[in-house]
Amino acid sequence: MAFRLKLCPEKTNIDFFWAAPVTFGFSVFLMAASLVAWLTLGLNFGIDFRGGTTIRTESTQAVDVAAYRAALEGQDLGDISITEVFDPGFRADQHVAMVRIGAQDATQSITPEQIGQVEEALKTVDPSITFPSVESVGPKVSGELIRSAILAVAAACAGIAVYIWLRFEWQFALGSVAALIHDVLVTIGVFALFQIKFDLTTVAALLTVLGYSINDTVVVFDRLRENLVKYKTMPLRDVMNLSVNETLSRTIMTLMTTLIALVSLLVFGGDVIRGFVFAITFGVVIGTYSSVYMAKNIVLYLGVDRGGPKKDSKAGTQFANIDA
């Protein structure tokens, strides 16, 4: 006998749309508040978007990220990111790290003298350390990365809209895109409010959130489309409630299993990936909310064409009066 785990009873009848104006208004408020936080507080851009210097280190000793960071704390260099690099092609005694130092103003990166101070500070931790390369990213390149990131998110939303439009109807596409914009904007608003570092990994997290959110939305939309055919005389609101209730167990299980992995990474993953994991963790939660209370509310307000093709009353009677 197959064992199926169900978090909800077979028949649930939760009215998700009893306060549709309130939930929709709350979603709009979240978007507006996030936009205000973004425009007034700004984002705490990382080195990728602000510019800076990257120093590659190599040593025969194991990389001690904590010791490297402690040695550089007294240099007054601002934003510093240290990550160990792993590659199957490295020798057994080849240990590589990347030290990224953010630009301290909008016009230039750190000076050669400061780079020398960084190298000397790291040599006090590991005398065998070497510095094969030093690369700097200027504000112009950082600005291009910002534009590319915006284009990537916009292209993802546009592609998803076209897909939903072709598979369902334009009302579904509009609801889906509104939910995606809601998810991205609210997540960015949280980053602005708490001044969490925003870099290229955060953009990757936002794209991941878009994929998760649209997957959750499409599952309910697909069930809604089936039920619209099955229950042709049932009011649209009741059909939508039925569809959300029928997929509720799947939605909760997907969310919980995803959060188990993400919370573990958030707690034990360390500082390097914390911003990335936080963006996904918050995004999947807000995405689950928006898939019901943003996307479905818009479809409910716009309505759905349930008439289908009209039958021809003369069909099949063309030859009724012809004598045999």
Curated annotation (Swiss-Prot):
Residues that span the membrane, as ranges: 16-36, 145-165, 174-194, 201-221, 247-269, 276-295
GO cellular component: plasma membrane
Annotated InterPro entries: SecD/SecF_arch_bac, SecD/SecF_bac, SecD/SecF_CS, SecD_SecF_C, SecD_SecF_C_bact, SecF_bac
Location, primary (coarse class): membrane
Subcellular location field: Cell inner membrane
Keyword Membrane: yes
Membrane topology label: Multi-pass membrane protein
GO-annotated biological processes: intracellular protein transmembrane transport; protein targeting; protein transport by the Sec complex
Listed SUPFAM superfamilies: Multidrug efflux transporter AcrB transmembrane domain
UniProt-listed NCBIfam families: 2A0604s01 (TIGR00916), transloc_SecF (TIGR00966)
Family statement drawn from the similarity comment of this UniProt entry: Belongs to the SecD/SecF family. SecF subfamily.
HAMAP family reported for this sequence: SecF_B (MF_01464_B)
Name recorded for this polypeptide: Protein translocase subunit SecF
Species name: Cereibacter sphaeroides (strain ATCC 17023 / DSM 158 / JCM 6121 / CCUG 31486 / LMG 2827 / NBRC 12203 / NCIMB 8253 / ATH 2.4.1.) (Rhodobacter sphaeroides)
UniProt gene name: secF
